[in-house]
């Protein structure tokens, strides 16, 4: 029998306690995997609430927002892309875990025991530490994780900048738990470990006193996101910072942190944000002579090269001055307003798609996913001021009208159905004219 809580909304108290990992074992222990709520999905309104609170606090304390609009849109875009595969497949982190549990478990810990709950808490957090560390020390794993580090801002939207690829290696580090921790208990802590890490992506919280000794905090995680030399490969913790202190990877925040990749990618285009390092590995692999050197390109650190230590040379990491200017869009304010409106519409269709997944045909589901990806890519092109941005936006608006006409996209407000068609027809005409100018003369700026 399914637990009613799996279908119910969480209270305000539960929502914030989910984010701070303070839910009690008695209210988060379930006998079967099917009973486990989708805590990440239920946390969405609390993500939004904290992001708005961060905005207000930042204005009060610093007189400015906590980040830039174009960077925030790119971070949320990455989060959207990372969740799209779950529309078609069950998470590999769960699938692999269930397989090991059903075929190779050594013994069963009771699912309703607080000791099992706390053991899973420690086990998942320990597994996360080692996954996270390897995601920085193994180049092919860094190809996925670098997405999260590509933001040059550090705020709550940065927490949403997730990788499409990362999940395909992270499951390995949690697999040993399947020898004795029931899948339902694991699924709870896998979500809570992720949710906890949302609120630590902020600059509006300074030092948390004694909690800094035990927990991963905004201060500790700011160091992890820094590209200063003293920040590189430090503070891998998920929840407990003690792992870094035990294994020698801890570093306290002691100077202004400059965020982002050591070699910034300077784009807001989400596909490039996700996959650019894979192309870099591919190019380096073929340019590097020798079988063992090629092997090392894939499995040693991102900074490795022939004749260098496994993790590369720290002196090759570019120095920072603290005066670095983050990459920003040169688009007009009017264009930014347009992208925000289109992004908001896409999010509405995205949420509706997840809510109605069971009722949608595979064709409709696939077309919606294609539209979402095209929308995110087109917005990235517009913010980057790419030469072919107008052409892509024309095609995107045309696709919207076609999906709308053939019933693959529902009107968000039925009474405004005609208005939507008129607005998108105008957009097609506008961007179509821009496209013709691009094709016949110079790129539009």
Swiss-Prot record:
A motif (Histidine box-1) lies at residues 132-136. A motif (Histidine box-3) lies at residues 221-225. Changing residue 148 to A: Loss of function. Its cofactor is Fe cation. It is a multi-pass membrane protein. It catalyses: 1-O-(1,2-saturated-alkyl)-sn-glycerol + (6R)-L-erythro-5,6,7,8-tetrahydrobiopterin + O2 = a 1-(1-hydroxyalkyl)-sn-glycerol + (6R)-L-erythro-6,7-dihydrobiopterin + H2O. One of its GO terms (molecular function) is glyceryl-ether monooxygenase activity. It comes from the Eukaryota. The chain crosses the membrane at residues 43-63, 111-131, 334-354, 363-383, 413-433. Its main location: endoplasmic reticulum. Coiled coil: none annotated. This is Alkylglycerol monooxygenase. The lineage of its organism: Eukaryota, Metazoa, Chordata, Craniata, Vertebrata. The gene is AGMO.
């Amino acid at each position: 029998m399914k637990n009613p809580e799996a279908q119910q909304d969480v209270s305000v108290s539960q929502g914030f306690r989910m984010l701070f990992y303070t839910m009690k074992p008695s209210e988060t222990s379930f006998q079967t995997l099917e009973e486990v709520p989708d805590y990440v999905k239920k946390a969405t309104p609390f993500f939004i609430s904290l992001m708005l609170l961060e905005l207000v606090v930042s204005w009060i304390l610093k007189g400015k927002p906590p980040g830039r609009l174009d960077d925030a849109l790119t971070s949320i875009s990455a989060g959207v892309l990372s969740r799209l595969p779950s529309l078609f497949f069950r998470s590999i982190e769960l699938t692999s875990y269930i397989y090991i549990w059903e075929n190779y478990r050594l013994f069963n810990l009771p699912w309703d025991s607080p000791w099992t709950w706390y053991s899973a808490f420690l086990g998942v957090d320990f597994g996360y530490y080692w996954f996270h560390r390897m995601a920085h020390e193994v180049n092919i794993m860094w190809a996925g994780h670098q997405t999260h580090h590509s933001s040059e801002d550090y705020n709550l939207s940065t927490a949403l900048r997730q990788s499409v690829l990362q999940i395909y290696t992270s499951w390995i580090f949690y697999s040993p738990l399947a020898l004795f921790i029931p899948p339902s208990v694991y699924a709870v802590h896998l979500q809570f470990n992720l949710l906890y890490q949302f609120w630590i992506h902020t600059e509006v919280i300074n030092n948390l006193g004694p909690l800094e000794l035990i927990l991963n905090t905004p201060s500790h995680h700011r160091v992890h996101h820094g590209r200063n030399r003293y920040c590189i490969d430090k503070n891998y913790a998920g929840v407990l910072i003690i792992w870094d202190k035990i294994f020698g990877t801890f570093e306290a925040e002691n100077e202004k942190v400059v965020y982002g990749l050591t070699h910034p990618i300077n784009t807001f285009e989400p596909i490039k944000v996700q996959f650019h390092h894979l192309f870099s590995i591919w190019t380096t692999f073929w340019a590097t002579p020798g079988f063992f050197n090629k092997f090392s390109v894939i499995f040693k650190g991102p900074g490795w090269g022939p004749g260098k230590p496994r993790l590369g040379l720290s002196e090759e990491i570019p120095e920072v001055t603290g005066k670095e200017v983050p990459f920003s869009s040169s688009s007009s304010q009017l264009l930014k307003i347009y992208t925000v409106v289109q992004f908001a519409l896409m999010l509405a269709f995205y949420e509706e798609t997840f809510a109605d997944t069971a009722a949608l045909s595979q064709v409709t589901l696939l077309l919606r996913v294609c539209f979402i990806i095209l929308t995110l890519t087109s917005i990235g092109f517009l913010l980057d001021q790419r030469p072919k941005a107008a052409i892509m936006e024309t095609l995107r608006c045309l696709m919207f009208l076609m999906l709308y006409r053939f019933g693959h996209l529902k009107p968000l407000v039925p009474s405004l159905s005609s208005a939507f068609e008129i607005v998108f027809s105008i957009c097609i005409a506008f961007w179509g004219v821009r496209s013709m100018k691009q094709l016949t003369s110079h790129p539009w700026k």
